[in-house]
């Protein structure tokens, strides 16, 4: 079964996809489906993207034969789910990859965003990586994913609504104002075009955001120099995590950009990246439990300024 079901209690869509139950879980290198010679990639490759074998959304989803019954609504789960394999090296990750390889990865993200946005049914393109079994990564081989949604996910609607409200009241993008107001205490790493910081409003311990200093709303607006610097910042932030905690530090990396084939919100929506780590120190997990899940009221046990200091003072080689 694969379909969308509407929740009238929260005004959001839920994706029902039984196919995701079949995904492999933490296979060894010899059984890895995305190593060279594996099930998905039998030929040599550098980096590659392909449609997920176990998708939540499909370009040609099965039809939904359903008549609306009271509050119960269903729709076809039309969309795209892609896997992005960063490298053929099973034993590396963003912190250890050559900078040139990450630059090529950024170009691939841009290309896939451009191509997927051409589909009329695509409303939102979400690029992400789950690193580590602590956040549910099913494959240890370095990879991420891209979901092209046929609707605006709820948190995206909330972000757009909040940024719109701020812009209407202040006549300024909220992230642009954050960039103008930030000092040194929450800074993690800075370049000419980007600032990586633990935000004043961090929800997770050691949460890091990456903000372009220039107001851009999607990856498609990045200049050549910005794309190169973006690759560098991604490498530095992830390397700082690994070195500070002396381990392959788990995280959820998420790219937030403006919607496509929807209302133009580019004047107030500022592209940004969020790293949400599931750990509150080297050996302890920060559980997203009842309060966070049920109310979206997050309790952060690590003071953002202290987390930023630790990450800022962790020196890494690029």
Swiss-Prot record:
Residues annotated to bind UDP-alpha-D-glucose: 130, 145
Is Nucleotidyltransferase there in the keyword field? yes
> One GO BP annotation here?
galactose catabolic process via UDP-galactose, Leloir pathway
Q: Which residues form the active site?
A: 143 (tele-ump-histidine intermediate)
Q: What is its EC number?
A: 2.7.7.12
Q: In which pathway does it act?
A: Carbohydrate metabolism; galactose metabolism
What is catalysed by this protein?
alpha-D-galactose 1-phosphate + UDP-alpha-D-glucose = alpha-D-glucose 1-phosphate + UDP-alpha-D-galactose
What the entry lists under Pfam families is as follows: GalP_UDP_tr_C, GalP_UDP_transf
Which residues does Zn(2+) bind? 32, 35, 90, 141
Q: Name one GO molecular function term.
A: UDP-glucose:hexose-1-phosphate uridylyltransferase activity
- UniProt KW keywords: Carbohydrate metabolism, Galactose metabolism, Iron, Metal-binding, Nucleotidyltransferase, Transferase, Zinc
Tell me the cofactor note.
Answer: Binds 1 zinc ion per subunit.
EC supergroup of this enzyme: transferase
Q: Which cofactor does it need?
A: Zn(2+)
Question: Would I find Zinc among this entry's keywords?
Answer: yes
Q: What GO cellular component entries does it have?
A: cytoplasm
Which family does the entry's similarity section mention? Belongs to the galactose-1-phosphate uridylyltransferase type 1 family.
Report what the protein is called: Galactose-1-phosphate uridylyltransferase
Q: Which gene encodes it?
A: galT
């Amino acid at each position: 079964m694969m379909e969308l079901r509407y929740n009238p209690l929260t005004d959001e869509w839920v994706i029902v996809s039984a196919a995701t139950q079949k995904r492999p879980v933490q296979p060894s290198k010899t059984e890895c489906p995305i190593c060279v010679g594996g099930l998905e990639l039998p030929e040599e490759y550098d980096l590659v993207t392909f449609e997920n074998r176990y998708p939540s959304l499909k370009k040609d989803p099965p039809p939904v034969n359903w008549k609306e019954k009271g509050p119960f609504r269903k729709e076809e789960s039309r969309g795209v789910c892609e896997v992005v394999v960063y490298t053929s090296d099973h034993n590396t990750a963003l912190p250890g990859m050559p900078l040139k390889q990450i630059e090529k990865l950024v170009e691939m993200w841009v290309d896939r965003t451009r191509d997927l946005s051409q589909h009329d049914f695509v409303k939102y393109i979400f690029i992400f990586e789950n690193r580590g079994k602590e956040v549910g990564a099913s494959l240890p081989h370095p990879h991420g994913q891209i979901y092209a949604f046929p609707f605006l996910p709820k948190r995206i609607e909330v972000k757009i609504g909040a940024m719109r409200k701020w812009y209407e009241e202040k006549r300024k993008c909220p992230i642009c104002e954050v960039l103008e107001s930030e000092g040194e205490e929450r800074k993690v790493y800075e370049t000419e075009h980007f600032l990586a910081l633990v935000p004043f409003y961090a929800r997770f311990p050691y949460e890091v955001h990456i903000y372009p200093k220039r107001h851009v709303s999607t990856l498609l607006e990045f200049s050549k120099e910005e794309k190169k610097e973006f690759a560098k910042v991604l490498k530095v932030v992830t390397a700082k995590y690994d070195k500070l905690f002396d381990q392959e530090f788990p995280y959820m990396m998420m790219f937030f950009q403006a919607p496509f084939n929807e209302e133009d919100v580019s004047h107030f929506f500022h592209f940004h990246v969020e790293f949400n780590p599931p750990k509150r120190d080297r050996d302890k997990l920060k559980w997203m439990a009842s309060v966070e899940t049920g109310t979206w009221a997050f309790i952060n046990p690590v003071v953002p300024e202290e987390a930023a200091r630790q990450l800022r003072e962790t020196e890494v080689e690029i």
